[in-house]
């Protein structure tokens, strides 16, 4: 059995794989030609795109924020309250009104009307305060009149703190004698709701709840305790890295040299506008690295990514304010650092360990859904049973929170999809399936939202889209060619004559291609897929067809190997199976010798002997003689017959790095292999228990129930196995990410994790081999259907 599966050889019907004709790949699934070659101009264009992407590291800019720029424009001069301190911001506002009279990121976006209303009103306040731009003011009022319906529309994406800030700006407009064309009843309702929100916050200030509205301090106006607020001023002079809030402190409180210095430093960078958050370096670099990984092209920028993560790690160790003052930054930094082999402690996330504490001590900036999503993602990378209990608690409350949010019928579709994806275990998905979905949903006009919507030029651009799409299609072309090779091999080995459908090739190859997808790993990928087919086939034979004597015959043939002709074949199916095995191992051994510079064939043969002898134990002692093994006895055998030692250790030789005999036989490799095999076996046993019970096959669930003498129910047995499985999974991830004293190259350690990822992925929606329709869609997406998001 392979990848945690003990599957019957059930042919997938032709209609389930898009009427595949086994003799012609051009008719397979999507009816597209197999070979696609890139022109010289295309290759050159992609190289140029790659260089432009490389240049974006450290140079990413956020879009101008009309909202924040307007607040900065309202700051009076330190020398005269009747003059603006930053007149250049007023000039920017005058020059950047949209044709419809609005200001904002994208007034035509159907879900950003509230954002446009907020930015427009802030801009009108700045113009009216300094008595300029009468024409622009009238046009802006016209926009508010025609779009005022969105103020209380629950289907709109709302800027953070809108319910506090927008009514405050309405009050300010009245003081400036700016008559807003809004429904008076709606205005009164908003003002009442704002007062109640502020009253609750001020009443519970000493209990921590005031933190919920501090980020929206410009919406508190004179009600804000600005003197106390200034105690939260950051080293860079800002309040919460927000230009708008910092500007409000200068408007409502008093002149502060550090606040002025902060705003002035931003304007030195951008001349006459400000973004909605600054500084942006850590923010932008984290999101860029995450985007590159999600797009599946981070391998092209290893040097740049490492440079960014090294810098983030240095700042992490220094407890840098820009990282730790923002929960989304902190959570994302933790996840990216841990998953890229940096040693980081989950104790740094202790402040977010429960929902109530999070919402009563976090500023409003931290409470947007992005922060919750990033916290949940960070909680999934636990590697310590005891040390990472903090992550378990975070995982529980963030999942519950998102589940409740998903019940809200007004939740924007964009947020809904993000939450649904975040709630899926990151180790229970096929990488290339998710990469395709990410590319398909990638939009150059994508935005994020704080108190104003914003976009990042370096993260949402045409180069990233074109480059990732081109790379996906190149890999896809390679996969189609490899699948053709697999089909020729399958036919040459006559495996159909022993009951194995050729259509099984698609699923077997897809499982590894969807995770170990890089072109340079073609040899390892093909070996892995072939082993998957042969191991699953022999396992099913022994379960249902082959007698004990035939298995003993196969073992003797493998033990003799070069002298197999002196042994003879007990049956035709034994002959077909052994010759397929022999040809496969000989071919792989030759390739491995070329890559390793030494002969490893004896090791490959011994791996098969060990597995076959363990299969004999399963067949003879446990099935024929109905002996029930102890848990220890069962795992010592079943973790070998699952196939992990055989196909993973074999594939290691083909990944590229040279591995000495000492490394292969090291305790590190042994521990990785044992842990991987245990997880794969336990995954298999949980999902195949009912079927194996009907077949009288031994299974971990049945052993626990039997040994308990009726004191453990089936549900309890499965719960205990899941606990064992989770413990082993974390242990494995910890070993894979551990750099200290590791002899094994990272790409080799990753293959063990890849194997577990595949096993979990297969069973995410049940036994993948028993749900061919879903796998048909996955195979189409990863191997056959080209991406075409970008249309030049």
Curated annotation (Swiss-Prot):
GO terms for molecular function: carbon-oxygen lyase activity, acting on phosphates; magnesium ion binding; terpene synthase activity. It is an enzyme of class 4 (lyase). A motif (DDXXD motif) lies at residues 539-543. Disulfide bonds: none annotated. It catalyses: 8-hydroxycopalyl diphosphate = cis-abienol + diphosphate. Mg(2+) 2 binds at residues 539, 543. Its cofactor is Mg(2+). Pathway: Secondary metabolite biosynthesis; terpenoid biosynthesis. Involved in the biosynthesis of cis-abienol, a labdane diterpene that can be used as synthesis precursor of ambergris substitution fragance products. This is Cis-abienol synthase, chloroplastic.
